[in-house]
Amino acid sequence: MSEKTFLVEIGTEELPPKALRSLAESFAANVTAELDNAGLAHGNVEWFAAPRRLALKVANLAASQPDREVEKRGPAIAQAFDAEGKPSKAAEGWARGCGITVDQAERLTTDKGEWLLYRAHVKGESAEALLPNMIATSLAKLPIPKLMRWGASDVHFVRPVHTVTLLLGDKLIPATILGIQSDRVIRGHRFMGEPEITIDTADQYPQILLERGKVVADYEARKAKIKADAEEAARQIGGNADLSESLLEEVTSLVEWPVVLTAKFEEKFLAVPSEALVYTMKGDQKYFPVYAADGKLLPNFIFVANIESKDPQQIISGNEKVVRPRLADAEFFFNTDRKKRLEDNLPRLQTVLFQQQLGTLRDKTDRIQALAGWIAEQIGADVNHATRAGLLSKCDLMTNMVFEFTDTQGVMGMHYARHDGEAEDVAVALNEQYQPRFAGDDLPSNPVACALAIADKMDTLAGIFGIGQHPKGDKDPFALRRAALGVLRIIVEKNLNLDLKTLTEEAARLYGDKLTNANVVDDVIDFMLGRFRAWYQDEGYTVDTIQAVLARRPTRPADFDARMKAVSHFRTLEEASALAAANKRVSNILAKSDEVLNDRVNAATLKEPEEIALALQVVVLRDKLEPVFAEGRYQEALVELAELREPVDTFFEKVMVMVDDKDLRINRLSMLAKLRELFLQVADISLLQ
């Protein structure tokens, strides 16, 4: 069977840069799944993506599906014919479905009986016939949140489509995809190379596009070139380029023929906080900032043009002219904002609504101030500094700089606080109050910042849950999931002695009578414990380990983490499996009994040596582990409890629990309850699989 290279390219108008990679990867995954489901053998599936095209190249694609034998069993012979040997309606209906008559059917005989059988040789369909529908189906499944319609057509896609090319080897596959008839013509760069190129074979792609069309269709090659050229350009001026992955991806998705150039701006702008300058360069202009070896921003930036100009200086000058007014704005805002103290912005917070039922940003500031001070007292931070940080926490939102460059909130508060002579940990806290902003982000660096960050997030959680507006589905307008996980990360990773229950109660109390949800505390705790589940699953913990700890509903995050590590270690012990099974057995026995158990085990009632031995061991371990549990040394406790494996196994082998003697039965049940209580001090081990 001959194998050929298959090429599909969809030529479009400029695709959304932030979605380009995901579109291409999804397209490749969808087509691969279609090929596999159809049984079409193939080699590597390679994807290509540029601003105006999505393409796939499939190596060694089989010319057709393999032929296959089809067998379809019909009714049993006893039901297929009546007493006179005439076919039954069931048999005739089955035969019609197979496209035959009953007398054309074969018979299948096994040791269980005899049935009608249809057997046929089905010839595999050609790849040429199957591919158009596969491509159309794969495109329809792309993750496109908002589709476009263009012209008079009813066709919808992420952007208008101009060309479609489907080549199997050197043969053009006739098809209409997204309203466009397939053709050999592909389009080159808008301003360089040949505008239209006729491609003869699939193997010519993407080289023909590179050489004649001046388009680097290989996404990874384009990205690597931008990265290497930008690093070299930065070295040429004695610096290091800030090549953040997200911006590098976005720039890669914006250009077809990357040309890296270096430009500069006036050194006077370096007096403005670098964060504001970087925000302008990266966020607005898609430029790469350049830093000196000491980490200070240089008066240069690197950008990527989409054309190879005969006069690159003209492009450089143009970009310098574009960025200068933005930097001048930042300079003006910075100088204007510093003419008054940060604290002077407090009254203006009264004019900005936080949430209609929960009041203004000034109301939120007052709550954060009080809660940050309370948290600081719990964790041993400077209470005065924490309350001061709380008071100033939202003041920078009223500054010109943050109003214009919104992503500088927090960091500008820090710079203005330093200018005003505030304590350094207060200034730093203003910047770090929003941390962690995303998974893997840094945590607040000092205790005051931790207190403020937790206070800000807990105020939002208590308030929004307090009016019954918890997240539903994908909708989370107040970013409560991120806030909850942020609080948990800070408490766990900083090992802070905070309890979610008292923390939520205090946050809710500060709202006065504004909250309408009487179950706000439990709702917030349940929500945060749910975030714990997601966090630990991402960390690689098994679901049953998480469930075992969640069953105890510990509300101190640092304590929760200690239990998780203890149970995870317990699972590695040789005794773990048997003790988990024993706990499950004990749990089931106790659940089925509705008898009132004794607070203490009556040693005089014990008869069998095995139950005496187990009871003694339980008492010894209870006394021994009491201080261990109190200090949260759960791993040590579970290692000690692993010693119970042998006496527990022996007990269940030799002793009947549910005996007729009521006093003896209750005593044995009471002993098992005491045994289970020991393990429940850490987690519900019975849930381990």
Swiss-Prot record:
E.C. designation(s): 6.1.1.14
Catalytic activity: tRNA(Gly) + glycine + ATP = glycyl-tRNA(Gly) + AMP + diphosphate
Any GO BP annotation: arginyl-tRNA aminoacylation
Lineage top rank: taxon: Bacteria
Location(s) in or outside the cell: Cytoplasm
Keyword Methyltransferase carried by entry: no
Signal peptide range: none
UniProt keyword terms in alphabetical order: Aminoacyl-tRNA synthetase, ATP-binding, Cytoplasm, Ligase, Nucleotide-binding, Protein biosynthesis
GO CC list: cytosol
InterPro entries: DALR_anticod-bd, Gly-tRNA-synth_bsu, Gly-tRNA-synth_heterodimer
Gene Ontology MF, one: arginine-tRNA ligase activity
Disulphide linkage map: none
Subunit field text: Tetramer of two alpha and two beta subunits.
Family note: Belongs to the class-II aminoacyl-tRNA synthetase family.
Listed name of the protein: Glycine--tRNA ligase beta subunit
Organism of derivation: Citrobacter koseri (strain ATCC BAA-895 / CDC 4225-83 / SGSC4696)
